[in-house]
Amino acid sequence: MTMNITSKQMEITPAIRQHVADRLAKLEKWQTHLINPHIILSKEPQGFVADATINTPNGVLVASGKHEDMYTAINELINKLERQLNKLQHKGEARRAATSVKDANFVEEVEEE
């Protein structure tokens, strides 16, 4: 998977690049094609910020993670992306209702007659 990693006010080390790649590989368990992931890593006075924009066939995932430690900010970012992917994958199942309350009452009335 190809990914773009951009940094602002800091240098990307091979260790950071490898950590991002390893954590993004965790998202592959959802069996969704990740189209052109773009990760932005920046250093701010309060700590580090990791932002991501990832296109998928079902929509766009956008998340941000902030922490004093760069690796923890990346982990927060990936956890947020994983929750979004889970929600996106199960969206159709959540909207599918077995029967509504009206239909259930109607079935009971028919049986009583």
Swiss-Prot record:
Keywords: Acetylation, RNA-binding, rRNA-binding, Stress response, Translation regulation. The keyword RNA-binding applies. The modification N6-acetyllysine is found at K66. GO terms for cellular component: cytosol; cytosolic small ribosomal subunit. The keyword Nucleotidyltransferase does not apply. Disruption phenotype: Non-essential gene, increased formation of inactive 100S ribosomes in stationary phase, which persist longer than in wild-type. Double hpr-yfiA deletion mutants form 90S ribosomes. A quadruple yfiA-hpf-rmf-sra knockout strain is significantly outcompeted by wild-type after 4 days growth. No visible effect on viability or growth rate at 37 or 10 degrees Celsius, slight effect on bulk translation and timing of expression of some cold-shock proteins. Belongs to the HPF/YfiA ribosome-associated protein family. YfiA subfamily. PANTHER family: 30S RIBOSOMAL PROTEIN, RIBOSOME-ASSOCIATED INHIBITOR A. This is Ribosome-associated inhibitor A. It comes from Escherichia coli (strain K12). The gene is raiA.
